[in-house]
Amino acid sequence: MPLLHTLGLFALTAVAEIVGCYLPYLWLKQGHSAWLLVPAALSLAVFAWLLTLHPTASGRVYAAYGGVYVSMALLWLWAVDGVRPATTDWAGVGLCLAGMALIMAGPRHG
């Protein structure tokens, strides 16, 4: 699978997971309608389905996906919650993405 396709799929997967977790947060912590649980459940189902589209071992997918998830979570924090990430947050994202690149580019045994 081409790298840009994989990264795009990871980004979509992260958004689906974040939305699926953010909507119940709005209900539980911010007093929004319990009806938000319906789109949250659908979003988490899409998240699980998207994970199946990756062509490598699931453990490796989850590990590599984690780097993109951390990046998307910080972007969500900034865009949706209006909290600007600190320099150390971005440094952490860089470390996560470096780890993701190492996992994705590393040799495959068996």
Curated annotation (Swiss-Prot):
Chief place of localization: membrane
Pfam families the UniProt entry points to: UPF0060
GO cellular component labels: plasma membrane
Sorted UniProt keywords: Cell inner membrane, Cell membrane, Membrane, Transmembrane, Transmembrane helix
Localization, UniProt: Cell inner membrane
InterPro entries membership: UPF0060
Transmembrane segments: 7-27, 33-53, 63-83, 86-106
Membrane topology recorded in Swiss-Prot or TrEMBL: Multi-pass membrane protein
NCBIfam families cross-referenced by the UniProt entry: PRK02237.1
Family, per entry: Belongs to the UPF0060 family.
Name of the protein: UPF0060 membrane protein Bpet0062
